[in-house]
Amino acid sequence: MALRTRLGEILRPLNAEYGKVAPGWGTTPVMGVFMGLFLVFLVIILQIYNSSIILENVDVDWVTVN
């Protein structure tokens, strides 16, 4: 028989839903939307870093950072 500890009793509710899966697609479409938005964010950051997007009056030179 497994040893019962106070920490185990506290953490037991967190493991109560183990193995249960929501039927159907669940929240997959929401995750897809957020992944798409994150991809757009990364592309914008990459284009700013690569100077593909020209920002008016913003100098993207490492010398000016110092």
Swiss-Prot record:
GO cellular component, one term: chloroplast thylakoid membrane
Gene: psbH
Transmembrane segments: 29-49
InterPro entries listed in its UniProt record: PSII_PsbH, PSII_PsbH_sf
Keyword terms, alphabetized: Chloroplast, Membrane, Photosynthesis, Photosystem II, Plastid, Thylakoid, Transmembrane, Transmembrane helix
Subcellular location: Plastid, Chloroplast thylakoid membrane
Source domain of life: Eukaryota
Protein family per UniProt: Belongs to the PsbH family.
UniProt name for this protein: Photosystem II reaction center protein H
UniProt GO BP: photosynthesis; protein stabilization
Pfam families membership: PsbH (PF00737)
UniProt KW Transmembrane keyword: yes
Subunit structure: PSII is composed of 1 copy each of membrane proteins PsbA, PsbB, PsbC, PsbD, PsbE, PsbF, PsbH, PsbI, PsbJ, PsbK, PsbL, PsbM, PsbT, PsbX, PsbY, PsbZ, Psb30/Ycf12, at least 3 peripheral proteins of the oxygen-evolving complex and a large number of cofactors. It forms dimeric complexes.
Described purpose of this protein according to its UniProt entry: One of the components of the core complex of photosystem II (PSII), required for its stability and/or assembly. PSII is a light-driven water:plastoquinone oxidoreductase that uses light energy to abstract electrons from H(2)O, generating O(2) and a proton gradient subsequently used for ATP formation. It consists of a core antenna complex that captures photons, and an electron transfer chain that converts photonic excitation into a charge separation.
Any one GO molecular function term: phosphate ion binding
Signal peptide positions (record): none
Keyword presence, Transmembrane helix: yes
Membrane topology field: Single-pass membrane protein
